[in-house]
Amino acid sequence: MGMTLAEKIIARAAGRDSVRPGEIVTCKVDLAMMHDSGGPRRVKPILERLGAGVWDPQKVVVVSDHFVPAVDAESAAILDLTRKWTAAHGIGNFYDMQGICHVVLPERGHLKPGMFVVGGDSHSPTGGAFGCFMFGVGATDMAGVLVTGETWIRVPETIRLDWRGRLGRGVSAKDMMLATCARLGMDGGDYQAVQYTGEAIATLAMSERMTLCNMAAELGAQTGIIAPDRVTADFIAAAGGEAGDIDRWQGDADAACRSVHEFDADTLDPQVAAPHSPANAAPVAAYGNVAFDQAYIGACTGAKLDDLHMAAAVLKGRQVAKGVRLLVAPASTRITAEAAADGTLATLTAAGALMLPSGCGACAGLGAGVLAEGERCISSTARNFKGRMGAQSAEVYLASPYTVAAAAVAGRIADPREFLDGGG
Amino acid sequence: MGGQGGRAWVFGDDIDTDTLAPGLYLKRPIDELARHCLEAVDPGFAAGVQPGDVVVAGRNFGMGSSREQAVEALRHLGVDAVVAESFAGIFYRNAFNLGLLALICPGVGRIGGGDRVAVDGEAGVVRNLSTGETWACEPVPAHLMDMVRDGGLVPHLEKRLAARR
């Protein structure tokens, strides 16, 4: 019997001809990525205690994105430590305040199909969009990787999410994932590998594929993964990387999966997830008059260039409703520059958006845009757990950038298709 | 985790890492962060939990972020063991890395808050001393039990590195 893509990557990293689900194997790590929150400030004391250095500084990428820019003495100290530690350990791949790690990593050409990658953040499955096996670990696990260059893994089964058809106008990868969370639940991924397949996936741009793999975390999967194709190779080449042999990193036709779930992209409507779980998703039409204090477009999940384009398509020539504040935090400084060059930023700011720094920001309750008690926000981020974006009694609804922008204009939940050219 | 057992603190399904280690306090020292551990679902937990007490939970305990302060806060408060119907994968790894025993134990949700519970990690058995019920847990992979015996990944690596020298 053949192997899935995930199994092939793990077998290669474990130095084996083949692996089977359930086996526990030790893998050599091709790349380790960490950020300012779970990275240097947490691994430094561990490495010092062990009297050990970094196994291969070339294989480490550090991105400051959680506490950027510094807003108080504590965040300034964390960033200072991050800079000093990366310099002391010769980490050349340090991206300081240039965007969110999951977006910066592929943007700078670090990912290549077939790689076995660990990231010190739960949304690390994002890298699976590039045909990598990439998963999130905590800081002590990361310290172990930094010292030994290896980590253990229980070979996951593969769960296939097969998407037929094509997404309609005003519907995006975010809607696909909210609908998936609603159907499978927050532990439907059961720490296995979720692989996205089907015509709808093949037609998606890389940024949308990143959103799918990113939110595999919300299914409780160990990772999300998409087999590389020409779209993948073109993105990597444009980012200055090398895609390598994409034909090698495909699953075998006779590989066994735990299960296959079928979805229909043609009939998918824009989705909104009510507080306090991404799995509380329902089509936008299921909601009545839900009004908002804040609309937030940000994070690795919802503020890539395509996400900003979605918001701009709705906001063009319109104004944010009175009483609503629209905050936009582009996922990287490169995206900000591209959005400035193509006129997207002008569209957003003309509509009344306030631009925020590129970083994790309010998504993780850390940066600008956190909520007061009793406030309600609609957000393009990935999680709406109670208290995550600020006060315990605040409510966060999750939606696509299209739908967040539509809510900003309407002041309440609205179907974004009514705001797009030719709509209404 | 001896014969006297500890008090059971019982939680439901899908307890997330923002609840265990709220983002608002992530940049604060662990003693301050730990005071807010689980406060969104049980405001009395951090002040009331005693060393040796046991956290009992439903499905998908520790879902969400990879922040290991979610485990560290429990350890800081003296919790040595969490028994749950199931765990989120990253939390499960983090638990053993920091020497916290995480036992998957179907049916354990029947334990009542305040019951006396004894956990035997080596045997993989959870006993409700208040009711006499016992549960067999899913076996823990041998390399993770080794790690817990050593007190976590760092002391475990210390041993490995010392052996190499």
Regions found by a protein language model. Name each.
Chain A
Residues 1-424:
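Fe-S-dependent hydro-lyases/dehydratases of central metabolism
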